[in-house]
Amino acid sequence: MRILSSLILLIALAIALVSATRPVVLMHGVTTGKESMEPLKSWIEESIPDIYVLNVEIGNGAFDSIFTTMDSQIEEFAQVVQADPKLANGFNLIGFSQGTLIARAFVQRYNNPQVYNYISWNGPQGGQFGTPFVNIPWVDKVLGTIPYEKTIQKKLSVAEYWKDPHRIDKYLERSIFLADINNEYQVKNTTYKENLTKLNAMVLTYSTNDKTIIPKESGWFSFYADGSGTEVVPLQQQTQYSEDWLGLRTLDESNRLFFYTTTCTHRDHPIEDYCKPYFTNFTLPYLQN
């Protein structure tokens, strides 16, 4: 009888452990679709048996990732995750490149279902200032010349997080996305900070060999000093941090903000197997709690 009771207890415990494994949602980057995240999906499923992983694609993938506004992409992302009953009790969230901004904006604006751990792979968190970026010549030319024209802001997703350190006033006046989700406007959105500080963990990574995200340290919210295209100001030395506009200082001081670097090139995340150790060391631990 005792053996039977112990067996039943072990089975119940195993079921509880499986059910306690939080689902994971993936959000791809610009100029790609969800197929680019399939290797990461496989790594997760191999590492955590029976886990549910949702690999989200916005619209038709590559085309819509460029020519759909960021707000529309975020709304579609929210609709997809909110319609999935397997995510109703919350999930962990991984974004890559532009997808890191879509994912973070979901946390700040919705956070329903709740996101527990947010993991940013090589994202332009502090902004983007450098071409070639999308490797479409006319798009890169527009980014380098007229990114803040109203029609461009409403037509090109990548223009919405273009941050020209030589034209900060124009950026703050015309940016319809990044200046908003980074809480850079004079009137702060308190909901953004409230939702972001509910995270158990925020994980930020950038690649020391990244030639796509410029500056590469933007993955850590670091960015060029106003008026400079060379001097990079670390997050902790920015007003963003000292005044805690988004809650990043709150997360940091409560040991919930984590910083990592990789050596894979931008496009090798998350495709090439030689990048897998970074997944194992810097991502997997945050999918198991």
UniProtKB/Swiss-Prot annotation:
Catalytic site: 97, 210, 266
What EC number is given for this enzyme? 3.1.2.22
**Family statement:** Belongs to the palmitoyl-protein thioesterase family.
What gene does this protein come from? ppt3
Asked if the record carries the keyword Nucleotide-binding, the reply is no
Keywords assigned by UniProt, alphabetized: Glycoprotein, Hydrolase, Lysosome, Signal
Reaction equation(s) it catalyzes: S-hexadecanoyl-L-cysteinyl-[protein] + H2O = L-cysteinyl-[protein] + hexadecanoate + H(+)
Protein name as annotated? Palmitoyl-protein thioesterase 3
